[in-house]
Amino acid sequence: MKECLFDRLYKEYEEFKSSILKLSKSDIFNKCYEIDVMTNIYDILMDKADDLSDEEMVALLGRKHILYELYGLQLKKDDYNYPELENLVNEEIRIL
């Protein structure tokens, strides 16, 4: 189960990176917030994966786009910093 989650997160992150790298330099610069948040979400989830229960992993894997869904939730927040993002990810995992 854990390997499936690792593979899925890696695939989503690589697809995101690939889509960004196809953009112009100016467009990449304009997406720096998205790049930062998506990278941090990916890192947080990869770090947490070892501690997740099977039920939590199944719930995450049931999402269509794990990283983009969490990014969308972050966009609704007023502020952004790493600890708050980590809390957001943890809270979403708890309510799955």
What do these predicted ranges mean?
Residues 1-96:
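Acidic interaction surfaces
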